[in-house]
Amino acid sequence: MIAVIGGGASGLMAALTAAEHNDEVVLLERQPRVGRKLLSTGNGRCNLSNINAAPQKYHGADVQFVQPALAAFGVPDTIEYFRGLGLLTVCEADGRIYPWSNQAGSVVDVLRLAAAGRGISLRTDCQVTALRQTAAGFALELGEHRLLADKVIVCCGGLAGGKVGGSGSGYALLQGLGHTCTRLYPSLVQLKTDNTFVRALKGVRAKLPWHQHEHL
């Protein structure tokens, strides 16, 4: 049996992929429902991908770190994968790809239906409090219960989106198995200001130039 910890986008995709090989798959989600954070992505529309996705579009010390992922499962693969699940998509002028319905709920629905169709057991309100390796595989502590699995896929997500379930609980589970964690930094964050004049701008996106070290 394969246990997937986390019922977000990565957890659902991992569970579906594992089930393609006729393995018994159980997905464990600590919240009352799966895909909750997905519902808030793209201002509620769920930005699935971007037709212009490429390593040079990323920023950081090693912009090539995404190359293996894009080579293994690129944008065309993403579009075709969701089409196979019954989800039609639309590409906007700026390259962003959304579900045709413009509703993030459509993405969650097709993933849930696909999981049910492939016999994946979805267990919600089920938090993994500890994870350890055994001679036969892995033991997952679920409060008063224990689950034994041959393989485990950890898809708990990070600290982002605390209001919709982000907790970073997966870090502790992985560190307990001997993995290390680099220092965490916030990425997309709010700017604090007086709400009096900006309340009406909620949900509005704008492309602005960024100046740093005299460079645009």
Roles of regions detected by a PLM:
Residues G11:
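N-terminal Rossmann-fold NAD(P) dinucleotide-binding loop
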Residues E20-H21, Q31-R33, A54, D77-E80, ...:
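Residue-level recognition of phosphate/Mg2+-coordinating polar/acidic sites
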Residues D23-V26, T89, V152, C181:
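Hydrophobic anchor at the start of a short beta-strand
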